Amino acid sequence: MELTFLGTNAGVPSKDRNVTSMVLDLQNKQKSLWMFDCGEATQHQILHSHVKLSRINKIFITHLHGDHIFGLPGLLCSRSMGGTENPLTIYGPTGIKAFIETALTLSQSYLTYPLDIIEIEQDGFLFEEEGIRASCGALSHPVPCFGYRLEEDNKPGKLNADKLETENIPRGPWYKLLKQGKTVTLPDGRIIDGKDYLSTEIKGRCIVIFGDTQPTPNAVKLAENADVIVHEATFKHDMADKANSRGHSSTIQAAELAKKANAKRLIITHISSRYSPKETPELLAECHTIFDNTQIASDFETFKL
């Protein structure tokens, strides 16, 4: 998987960073792209990236503040003008449906593809498909806001070809079934269990993407044992009180969350305009005092997960 940040600024765009949006490339057979938030000018950012609108089949909205949704109507229409008929599903808090339908109705816009809008009212399971189980958890912000947890299925271990050869099991179409851990009957009548020829299964990855939030116990629960957490760090820690009063987090608070959740990796984003690119190393340094494996995202940066 790869995660590309299209916008990493908080609140309003700056000369160096656009407002929030990121795209997860599942790198699967379906070539699916999942977008998280869609701030103003996200589609313009896409023009400068490798992201293809037609491949985006899910959009997850964390909350209804403008810097996270004002890019949606234009993006939906541009996706349609590209001629795609691929279905699109949008998940978001209550109100996202009215926002989208009002924008499309008043502008008399027509979409060439099926659009399904699913409103979220509480924590819990969302769906399981494409080898991923998705769930959400409520955060602490002035408006309803959610974080999303994606848990990848475990993958079968590698097939032990040497053991198969030692036991005189010839290569054939049954290898594919053995790799899946299934039981097969060989041409000579022998029945073998694929699980006996596989190494330990490969644990699936867990990725948690937060919306805006101040520290809250539910965030720790949502991020528990995650391989990667994407979390806002609007201000340096000397402005933690100001951050919290607006429903946001500081650098150190984001790092503390990752540590409490026993996460493996933290990527911070949603940086205030008061910090120039030259100052971002200072934000990262603060995180490193608490959680060493922290990175800071910039626009158009892609992280391998």
From Swiss-Prot:
InterPro entries named among the record's database cross-references: Metallo-B-lactamas, RibonucZ/Hydroxyglut_hydro, RNase_Z/BN
Gene3D superfamilies: Ribonuclease Z/Hydroxyacylglutathione hydrolase-like (3.60.15.10)
Binding site for Zn(2+) 1: H63, H65, H141, D212
Coiled-coil region list: none
Transmembrane segments: none
Cofactor note (record): Binds 2 Zn(2+) ions.
Keyword GTP-binding appears in the UniProt entry: no
Residues engaged in binding Zn(2+) 2: D67, H68, D212, H270
EC id: 3.1.-.-
Keywords attached to this entry: Endonuclease, Exonuclease, Hydrolase, Metal-binding, Nuclease, tRNA processing, Zinc
Record-level Gene Ontology MF annotations: 3'-tRNA processing endoribonuclease activity; exonuclease activity; zinc ion binding
Active site: D67 (proton acceptor)
Cofactor: Zn(2+)
Role description: Zinc phosphodiesterase, which has both exoribonuclease and endoribonuclease activities.
Binding partners and assembly: Homodimer.
Similarity comment: Belongs to the RNase Z family. RNase BN subfamily.
Name of protein: Ribonuclease BN
Protein's organism: Proteus mirabilis (strain HI4320)
